[in-house]
Amino acid sequence: MSDETMPVEFLVSDKRLLKTIKVKLETNGLFVTPIYSDNDNKVIKSSIEDLNHPLAVEINNIAGVKARFHESGNLERSEGHLKHQSNSITEFTKSFLKDHGLANDKIFLSHLLDHLPLKYTIYPPVVLFNNSTVRSFNHPIWQKAFQLKLFDPNEYYRELLCFLSPGKPSKGTSLHPNNRLLTHLAINNPITEADVLRRPFNIQPLYGKLIDDSILDDNDNTLWENPSQEQLNSSIWCKVIQNGVTQIWSPVFTMFSRGNIKEKKRVLTTFPDICNNDVVDLYAGIGYFTFSYLTKGARTLFAFELNPWSVEGLKRGLKANGFNKSGNCHVFQESNEMCVQRLTEFLSQNPGFRLRIRHINLGLLPSSKQGWPLAIKLIYLQGASLEKVTMHIHENVHIDAIEDGSFEKNVIVELDAINESIALIRNRGIKLQFVRSKLERIKTFAPDIWHVCVDVDVIVST
């Protein structure tokens, strides 16, 4: 999935406007719960990630409303609320720098603050700053301050972590894992789009080791492709709870997409027919959507994922959520091109078991087209045991193709063409019809580019 960007939120001084703004956002699939308080104002969150987004501009032009980025960062918590710092990172840094001898050099102090990173995400025990060329500790002005030893960067980072921490334990006590002190700082640089494993090669530690140096070897591909349990255990593992579901991952080797929370909730609240039916997740990752399907009572879930570090996060998440006890989630660390063979083997090993695949998740960006033929082959494999199977197709799409309907039309045309070639070999006495059900806008990926999920109902007839 994409590198993280900060969401836009709306500071509302007139409470009578709350419903109007909420409805505008909900209509466009951009409202994010909950609404929270900031002093005497209310703050409405959104999944918009650009202040120049047309709807952000429209709402910002309403008297009594101010659009802004959430500069103080976001802390995922079990109750789903944001941890909102009353004092910004800017004020903290200004105070620190003045206390360390820069009070009289107002120009240099101002330059440092102008390039101070403000956008970050808290994933205990790590604070990840967003990638930026303008506001970054890698900016020449900050590097100059470090080189001149005007202050100790480690001291600054350490105190910054204390400032950002949601709480400090009293003597002789410990915090809940979600509320423990933060211990690591890093910069979350973009992933390489061509990398099918979606690995964050460019994550840059600032404070604290994200992985034990002793296991690092630039010439050893096994660390990425086939890590030992010792290597897996040597990494920092982050944890968040979204919609009551725990997710775990190594920030060094895998990505986490906060913006998917809205789609995860949709899975949890929209599809009652998940219960007691089967699901195939062709791009499982760390369990982004896998856990939502399991929470909804999927009978059996088949998860495919290439990245061994993602698989480890998936397995840790299964255990943390208690899903490992039932044994109904089958994880395959290999290409999803093996899915038909693996499910065929599963059927042969479980006599009397009849597949009831009701949902097939295709959650890969920028495009999941590689998995479309596989999904169709799986439907032919199961035959006519269900009258309908829903494919959840994730893609990055230009806004024009969404609004004129051409994207959805082209999806159906492509699926029909794929099915025509597959049906010649695998029809098994059934016919498939592809019907557009719903297009969900999840988040903006880039200017005019949306991450969407289109639900396609596959009608199965004999």
Curated annotation (Swiss-Prot):
It is an enzyme of class 2 (transferase). It comes from the Eukaryota. GO terms for molecular function: S-adenosylmethionine-dependent methyltransferase activity; transferase activity, transferring alkyl or aryl (other than methyl) groups; tRNA 4-demethylwyosine alpha-amino-alpha-carboxypropyltransferase activity; tRNA methyltransferase activity. It catalyses: 4-demethylwyosine(37) in tRNA(Phe) + S-adenosyl-L-methionine = 4-demethyl-7-[(3S)-3-amino-3-carboxypropyl]wyosine(37) in tRNA(Phe) + S-methyl-5'-thioadenosine + H(+). It holds the Pfam family TRM5-TYW2_MTfase. Disruption phenotype: tRNA(Phe) from mutant shows accumulation of 4-demethylwyosine (ImG-14) and absence of wybutosine. InterPro entries: MeTrfase_TRM5/TYW2 (IPR030382), SAM-dependent_MTases_sf (IPR029063), TRM5-TYW2-like_MTfase (IPR056743), tRNA_wybutosine_synth_prot_2 (IPR026274). Its main location: cytoplasm. Pathway: tRNA modification; wybutosine-tRNA(Phe) biosynthesis. S-adenosyl-L-methionine binds at residues 257, 264, 305-306. Its EC number is 2.5.1.114. It is found in: Cytoplasm. GO terms for biological process: tRNA methylation; tRNA modification; wybutosine biosynthetic process. Keywords: Cytoplasm, S-adenosyl-L-methionine, Transferase, tRNA processing. SUPFAM superfamilies: S-adenosyl-L-methionine-dependent methyltransferases. Present with 656 molecules/cell in log phase SD medium. Belongs to the class I-like SAM-binding methyltransferase superfamily. TRM5/TYW2 family. S-adenosyl-L-methionine-dependent transferase that acts as a component of the wybutosine biosynthesis pathway. Wybutosine is a hyper modified guanosine with a tricyclic base found at the 3'-position adjacent to the anticodon of eukaryotic phenylalanine tRNA. This is tRNA wybutosine-synthesizing protein 2. The gene is TRM12.
